[in-house]
Regions:
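Long, K/E/R/D-enriched contiguous segments that form extended
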Residues: 41, 55-61, 71
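Nucleic-acid-processing active sites and adjacent nucleic-acid-binding tracks
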Residues: 1-46
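Short glycine-rich phosphate-binding loop at a beta-alpha junction
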Residues: 44-56
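Metal-dependent DNA phosphodiester-chemistry modules and their immediately adjacent helices/loops
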Residues: 63, 67-158
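Phosphate-handling catalytic cores of nucleic-acid transaction enzymes
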Residues: 156-168
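Short, glycine/acidic-rich beta->alpha junctions
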Residues: 31, 55-56, 135
Length: 168
């Protein structure tokens, strides 16, 4: 397959517990929602807000809403995939990667996705994460950028929640 020739090792990554393989040729994002519920149920980790890419998100949103997380309550926050929205987050990710502050535990999927990602700068000097080669995947890199954007937007709220848990 194209992914295999691009360096993807899906079967190995699944065997090692890094990914879950779903049926068909597209990603079943309801499985991602199930993962969040599993984290909450098993480890009692409360999800404060969840950022998501609007592309193909319908199944994810529907399942998350079944579990009680909604867009109306601002539990689910759409992060537009454009340079105006992601510029600050991309610059922060880049700086933290260069400073070796990002610990991805040598996750081979993250390493592969980060290696496939480049930065495109528009005429307004805004950054966007792009594939260095069309056939390669950058989903893990984009997820990290969305995480940084969510942290940037909701840092104060997150820090208050962490402080509250630590004081209990």
């Amino acid at each position: 397959s194209d992914d295999k020739s691009a360096g993807a090792k899906y079967e190995e990554w699944a065997k090692d517990g890094f990914i879950t393989i779903t049926e068909g040729n597209d990603i079943d994002l309801s499985v991602v929602a199930d993962f969040f519920l599993d984290i909450y149920t098993k480890y009692k980790i409360k999800l404060i807000r969840i950022g998501y890419d609007q592309r193909y998100a319908r199944a994810f949103i529907d399942r998350m809403e079944e579990y009680g997380w909604t867009r109306e309550a601002e539990d689910l926050v759409m992060i537009l995939q454009n340079a105006a929205t992601l510029d600050n987050a991309i610059r922060l990710v880049e700086a933290d990667l260069k400073a070796r502050l990002v610990n991805y535990n040598q996750n081979p999927v993250d390493k592969w996705c980060l290696g496939n990602a480049g930065i495109e700068i528009d005429n307004k000097r805004k950054c966007l994460c792009v594939k260095v080669e069309e056939r390669k995947r950058i989903d893990g890199a984009v997820t990290l950028i969305i995480l940084y954007e969510m942290y940037r937007r909701y840092r104060t709220e997150l820090e208050k929640a962490v402080k509250k848990v630590r004081n209990v």
